[in-house]
Amino acid sequence: MLHMNNTELLEQITRTIVDRFHPRRIILFGSQARGEANSESDLDLFIEMETQARPPERVVEVSSIFGLRPWSLDVVVFTPDEVQRLRRINGTLVSVIEAEGKVLYERPSF
């Protein structure tokens, strides 16, 4: 459960992920990003980062850094190569998130 106006919590979660994993991007998606969240809505985050872990392990790795929490968190983690490949295919989760999500963090490119 997450209160829709809890910007401070969202910023804290984003900072924690950035400090620990140094992702390329973090995007909020789902009902929270669309402004349709209610008291039962969870927090859906897309994370683009370099990793050698398999997809299920990526989710556990990110989710576990928050331990027990009073809010629900769902994450999807893709590598930059996966994002490049999947963004070109209409209807994939990546293409939908990029079109409809709210960017919370994007690493500056030099």
Where are these regions (language model features)?
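Catalytic core of pol beta-like nucleotidyltransferases
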Residues: 1-25, 34-39, 50-110
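Short, conserved active-site loops that position catalytic residues or coordinate cofactors/metal ions
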Residues: 41-43
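Glycine-rich beta-strand-to-loop/alpha-helix junction loops that act as flexible
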Residues: 29-31
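Short hydrophobic/aromatic beta-strand micro-patches
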Residues: 46-48
